[in-house]
Each structure stands twice: as structure tokens, then as C-alpha cells.
Amino acid sequence: QTPESFFSRFHVNMKVRHEVTAIHPEKKEVTVKNLETGEEFEESYDKLILSPGAKPTQPRLPGVGLDKLFTLRTVEDTFCIKDYINANHPKSAVLAGGGFIGLELAENLRELGMDVTIVQRPKQLMNPFDADMASFIHNEMRKHGVKLALGHTVEGFEERDGGVDVL
């Protein structure tokens, strides 16, 4: 998703690299700072929903700091991954995690022609779903060429022959 595609799809004006620095409930406004320019401005709201986000889980595993490994949580993370793919043209990717974000990334990487494997500790994708729904998702992913390694854990990463082995 880009801010433009998010707006065209949902009519939501997404501001990337901006931070809310103050909330003014009496005026129904927030103070926003552009992290690239330092400019601050006021933005009004009807209802304010606080969604501070989360940091992706990144376990302490051997090799986790390799430059060919990425976490995906923000639009900026997407840009980093896209830039890497455009510059290096990898043929395959292993995704650790089979939730909403992992499945969406798998779909996008397959559309780019990459071989994709999802490694997931639980024995099903989309853990919150029941087994029947998960089974449908498994079949769809396999039908579209995504390999599934369910019930497996990632133990670490090792750089080899210009790529990364997932242990």
C-alpha cells in the first residue's frame, strides 16, 4: 500500500513519516510534525482513535541482523523491501509468520514471480481463524504457488552464496 492507494481505496489520508506531538481535545485537533521537514501543523478531527501501532516481533536468533532480512510493519518497511527487490532481483523469499501481513506479502511476492515459503510455528495460517477457514486459506495459498512449512520454527539465519539460509 502507498498513501495514494490507501486514500483511493479507503478515503483515508495517510501521512507517512509524521508524528502526532500533542492532542488538543478541547479544539478537536492534533499537532502533527513532519519528520522529514520538521514542519508542524494542526489537523482537526471528529473522532480521535489512538492506534500507536506495534513493533514487529524480532526474536534474538543467530543472523537476525543480516542486511537481507526485513521486518514488515509500516509503509516505509514496504518501500525498503521493494527497493531491495528492485535492486537485487531475488528469486525466492521465506516469510516467518502467516498472519494478515505475511499473507499479503506472500501474494505480492508471488505476483513478482518469486518463490515464496511461509514458515509458521502454529500448524495453521491465520491463527485467529477456525480450522475449516484456515484449511481453505492453506489450499488457496498452495494453489497460488506458496509453499507452507507449518508447525516449524525459524532457528536462525546464515548467509551463503549471496543469499540467506533459514535454519
Each language-model region and where it sits:
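A Rossmann-like FAD-binding core segment of flavoenzymes
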Residues: K15-T31, E36, E43, E111-L167
